[in-house]
């Protein structure tokens, strides 16, 4: 289980987030641009440090301001799919996916087996030699996810993984994305602003405003209006403001 209780002062507001995500659970983090969603992912990944608080995985602290613990990003074993995918444009699809394994010093033969299995599962084996700069948006998304998954991460973080795709490709990718993530059976957080992602991918959804979690429901509850009888008027308006279906 991933447990987060952190505070960080930002330019326009203070980020204060308290969350827990179970193994195998996909949490959808929903909110407007600039509300702190990506910052929270970066705090979990170790790319930025909270001012105070604690982040732990299965009871082991990876950040604790009181105990002066701040595990390096590399040692946190996190698979991170950035919004722009962050593939190396001059490298082939194969080399991009193999990159994390090579930094761990695995033998080439083992890397070959693992990368082939991952590329075949992602439907990318046929374009393994293509440079990342020449493949489609959907292929980049699959390659970025394959690179994140192949290292057998303890946590998966995905920042707007479908935003660069057109609407038709987004619809086709949602089911595949959920299946690929669930194979890992680790706590996963996906940042999105689209309730279609919540409906098709997530197990639970949290809404963030100005650095704070203002609403948390299961994905089914979020999408099933009949179950919102106990929701406040403001909560319903918040959900409706993101509904695009």
Where do the language-model regions lie?
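Conserved ABC ATPase signature
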Residues: 131-135, 139
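A short, proline-enriched helix->beta-strand linker immediately N-terminal to the Walker B motif
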Residues: 150-154
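Conserved ABC ATPase "signature" region
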Residues: 60-65, 102, 109-127, 178-182
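Short coil-to-helix segment of the ABC ATPase nucleotide-binding domain corresponding to the Q-loop/switch region
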Residues: 91-99
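Catalytic Walker B motif of ABC-type/P-loop ATPase nucleotide-binding domains
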Residues: 156-160
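Conserved H-loop
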Residues: 185-191
């Amino acid at each position: 289980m991933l447990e987060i209780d952190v505070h960080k002062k930002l330019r326009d507001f203070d980020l204060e987030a308290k969350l827990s995500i179970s193994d195998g659970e996909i949490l959808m983090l929903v909110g407007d641009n600039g509300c702190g969603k990506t910052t929270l992912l970066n705090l979990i990944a170790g790319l930025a440090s909270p001012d105070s608080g604690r982040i732990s995985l299965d009871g082991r602290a990876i950040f604790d301001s009181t105990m002066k613990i701040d595990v390096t990003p590399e040692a946190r074993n996190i698979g991170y799919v950035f919004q722009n995918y962050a593939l190396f444009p001059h490298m082939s699809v194969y080399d991009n996916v193999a990159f994390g394994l090579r930094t761990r010093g695995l033998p080439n033969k083992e890397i070959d087996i693992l990368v082939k299995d991952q590329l075949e599962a992602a439907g990318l084996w046929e374009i393994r030699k293509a440079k990342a700069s020449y493949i489609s948006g959907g292929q980049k998304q699959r390659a970025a996810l394959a690179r994140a998954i192949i290292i057998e991460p303890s946590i998966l973080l995905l920042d707007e993984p479908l935003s660069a795709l057109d609407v038709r490709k987004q619809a086709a990718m949602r089911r595949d994305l959920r299946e690929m993530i669930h194979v890992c059976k680790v706590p996963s957080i996906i940042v999105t602003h689209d309730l279609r992602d919540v409906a098709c991918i997530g197990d639970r959804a949290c809404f963030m405003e100005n650095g704070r979690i203002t609403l948390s429901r299961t994905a089914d509850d979020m999408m099933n209006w009949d179950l919102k009888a106990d929701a406040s008027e403001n909560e319903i308006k918040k959900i409706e403001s993101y509904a695009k279906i």
